[in-house]
From Swiss-Prot:
Gene Ontology MF annotations: 5'-3' exonuclease activity; 5'-flap endonuclease activity; DNA binding; magnesium ion binding
Necessary cofactors: Mg(2+)
Native source organism of the sequence: Pyricularia oryzae (strain 70-15 / ATCC MYA-4617 / FGSC 8958)
Biased composition (Basic residues): 374-394
UniProt-recorded name of the protein: Flap endonuclease 1
Keywords assigned by UniProt, alphabetized: DNA damage, DNA repair, DNA replication, Endonuclease, Exonuclease, Hydrolase, Magnesium, Metal-binding, Mitochondrion, Nuclease, Nucleus, Phosphoprotein
Binding-site list for DNA: 47, 70, 158, 231, 233
Length: 394
């Protein structure tokens, strides 16, 4: 699920934290990728007539096709991917997982009804909601990655937390995930849309956590408290507390301890749920179960791909076309066998700003944030006008 509305808050209040660009801009970088999130996106995106792709034996192949070709695209663009798989979920996440299961059961019922009486759009909508990453999907993707020569790690718990550890240690440039809670785990840089298909033409989003904190004028603890208020995988949001209110509450009161205390005293008009262990949720963001960066499992390297092994697995066992798999495997072999040119930024160290420069920079960020808010407001106003305009009028 990630953090509800966090990207919108960052876009409006800390726009300088977000950079967008083409995938080729990530050339020469090592990136730790949230594998489960990627596999889920492959299962949803790689489809035909609203259904996941299958081979002649009825086995699902969407995840393998996505993993092979999207990884190949990254390697073609000079990126060295490392996939990180989820381990056992924290106990506090069990409520969210139960809700996801319930939603999928409801979606299955909706899908059956849509197939009988609904439109193609209804079938597609409910079909996507039934998607679940299974243990078999994970195991098959790990087998594929091994044959491709691409390293992977199985995290003790949350993959995003493990990605953040590797990014902080400098073992990778960034963590890549669609889940915004990666920032809560203190990954210096989050890349989004990295594993999207080229056809979607979505730019890569590069979000810098230091600039997020600077733009929001918060320390990390306040930022995590904001994310918990917005609603995360560990806790539901407090009823009637939306993104604007959550931001206002943190800015005015500074911490969840103060906010919750005032709510319980009736000084704030919101009601805290009876079981709302925000301290435990915060602790999971600050002290997740992860392998330290110097752990043996974190010593990874990219190997030469097993071309014949890939052909046997994808073509013979999974029914892929050899005319597509073999050239792809050979491209992978060539790309991974080429020593990559180092990025220029690796030769230079950043120079610290003076107090005056910091002050001027902060003011510049405030002006940019204000301009972004005005632009967003104008866009919303224009959309509302267009929606209200009668059809057939210019």
């Amino acid at each position: 699920m990630g953090i509800k509305q966090l990207f919108t808050i960052i876009k409006e209040n800390a726009p300088a934290a977000i950079k967008t660009g083409e995938i080729k801009n990530q050339f020469g970088r090592k990136v730790a990728i949230d594998a489960s999130m990627s596999i889920y996106s492959f299962l949803i995106a790689v489809r035909s007539n609203g259904e996941m792709l299958t081979n002649e034996d009825g086995q699902t192949t969407s995840h393998l096709m996505g993993m092979f070709y999207r990884t190949l695209r990254m390697v073609d663009n000079g990126i060295k991917p490392l996939y990180v798989f989820d381990g056992a979920p924290p106990k506090l996440k069990s409520g969210e997982l139960a809700r996801r299961y319930q939603r999928k059961q409801e979606a299955l019922e909706g899908l059956e009804e849509a197939r009988e009486t609904g439109t193609a759009e209804d079938v597609e909508k409910f079909s996507r909601r039934t998607v679940r990453v299974t243990r078999e999907h994970n195991e098959e993707c790990r087998q594929l990655l091994k044959l491709m020569g691409i390293p992977y790690i199985i995290a003790p718990t949350e993959a995003e937390a493990q990605c953040a550890v590797l990014a902080r240690a400098g073992k990778v440039f960034a963590a890549a995930s669609e889940d915004m809670d990666t920032l809560c785990f203190d990954s210096p840089i989050l890349l989004r849309h990295l594993t999207f298909s080229e056809a979607r033409k979505e730019p890569i989003q590069e979000i810098h956590v230091d600039k997020v904190l600077e733009g929001l004028d918060m320390d990390r603890k306040q930022f995590v408290d904001l994310c918990i208020l917005l609603g995360c995988d560990y806790l539901d949001p407090i009823p009637k507390v939306g993104p604007s209110t959550a931001l206002k509450l943190i800015r005015e009161h500074g911490s969840l301890e103060t906010i919750v205390e005032k709510m319980k005293k009736g000084e704030l008009k919101y009601t805290v749920p009876e079981d709302w262990p925000f301290e435990d949720a915060r602790d999971l963001f600050f002290n997740p179960a992860v392998h330290p960066a110097d752990h043996p499992d974190c010593n990874f390297k990219w190997e030469k791909p097993d071309v014949e092994g890939l052909v046997k697995y994808l073509v013979t066992e999974k029914g892929f076309s050899e005319d597509r798999v073999r050239p792809g495997a050979l491209r992978l072999e060539k790309a991974l066998g080429t020593s990559q040119q180092q990025r220029l930024e690796g030769f230079f160290k950043p120079v610290a700003r003076t107090a005056e420069e910091q002050k001027a920079h902060k003011r510049k960020l405030e002006v940019k944030a204000e301009e972004a808010k005005k632009k967003l407001k104008a866009e919303k106003k224009e959309k509302a006008k267009a929606k209200a305009r009668p059809r057939g009028t210019a």
